[in-house]
Amino acid sequence: QQLYIEWNSKINVISRKDMENFYLHHVLHSLSIAAQFQFGKDEEVLDLGTGGGFPGIPLAIFFPETKFLLADSVNKKITVIKEVAAAIDLKNVSTRHSRAEDIKDGKFDTVVSRAVAPLKDLWQWSRPLLRKSKGEGPNGLVCLKGGDLTLEIAESQCKPFVWDIHSMFAEEYFKEKYILFQPLK
């Protein structure tokens, strides 16, 4: 957390009003994915629109044998992620300064995302980046979403599995927070 406080004073990586709830709103929220899914050795996960490194950094710590590529279109955020990963000696994280549509050279077992775009767009960007996986992790798009998702899911024409995070973590913050999983078929 101290690393993020220091970087946030220079570059607005995380909303300043959110820093007092850093663990709950960012770390624990990201780790809700680990409460639902396991990622295996040598699986490759893309964190699309990683922002300050969430959910990618907490997941990479939790799954040290899984490879994570954290991508964002804002270069200053990628700079922060590189510094954080180096400071905590996180060897299974690489970064890419890129928009989702511009990633053409990789195939991943899983794409994860948090607070980036509507499901329709996330699936459109993610699907070409996914490969059929033989690993134990989720093979498809896993995203963290909030609020009433009825319209967003309908407009996406996806049929994701949906888990209520509040059933995993009792904190008030997690009411109306969900994990969505759209499998690659």
Which positions does each model-derived feature cover?
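Class I SAM-dependent transferase core
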Residues: Q1-K41, L46, K76-V93
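Conserved S-adenosyl-L-methionine
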Residues: D47-G51
